[in-house]
């Protein structure tokens, strides 16, 4: 039974995803359906959480829009979004960046990771 579930999970996994982790700034191209039309909306922010494994893996992106913090959680292997672009790599020491919710301005800025 577990082999059937594993095969089904592997069939629905996406292969076009870049490597990213907590602290990275990403652009998520989200498909928005309005009536009979669909369009692509870009949600850019910092990845504050990666959770789960396999097909059930999800990630949360946080941005500040007009002074209000907005967080959105996406299933990683979902057809909800078209693509993910990594804008910058962040240098953080935590896997979950919930402390960013309480920081404002320059204190909420994440140091950029240098690639060697």
From Swiss-Prot:
Entry's Gene Ontology BP terms: translation
A single cellular component GO annotation: cytosolic large ribosomal subunit
Cystine pairings recorded for this chain: none
Alphabetic keyword roster: Ribonucleoprotein, Ribosomal protein
Top-level taxonomic group: Bacteria
Example GO molecular function: structural constituent of ribosome
The UniProt record lists the keyword ATP-binding: no
InterPro entries: Ribosomal_bL19, Ribosomal_bL19_CS, Ribosomal_bL19_sf, Translation_prot_SH3-like_sf
Claim: Ribonucleoprotein is one of the keywords in the record: yes
A Pfam short name: Ribosomal_L19
Family statement: Belongs to the bacterial ribosomal protein bL19 family.
Functional summary from the UniProt entry: This protein is located at the 30S-50S ribosomal subunit interface and may play a role in the structure and function of the aminoacyl-tRNA binding site.
Protein name, as recorded: Large ribosomal subunit protein bL19
Biological source species: Nocardioides sp. (strain ATCC BAA-499 / JS614)
Record lineage: Bacteria, Bacillati, Actinomycetota, Actinomycetes, Propionibacteriales
């Amino acid at each position: 039974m577990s082999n059937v579930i594993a095969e089904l999970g592997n069939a629905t996994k996406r292969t076009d995803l870049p490597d990213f982790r907590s602290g990275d700034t990403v652009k998520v191209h989200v498909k928005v359906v309005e009536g009979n039309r669909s369009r692509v909306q870009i949600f850019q922010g910092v990845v504050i959480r990666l959770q789960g494994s396999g097909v059930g893996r999800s990630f949360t992106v946080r941005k500040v829009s007009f002074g209000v913090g907005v967080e959105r959680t996406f299933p990683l292997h979902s057809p909800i979004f078209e693509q993910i672009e990594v804008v910058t790599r962040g240098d953080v020491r935590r896997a979950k960046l919930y402390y960013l919710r309480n920081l404002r301005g320059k204190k909420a800025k994440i140091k950029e990771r240098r690639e060697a």
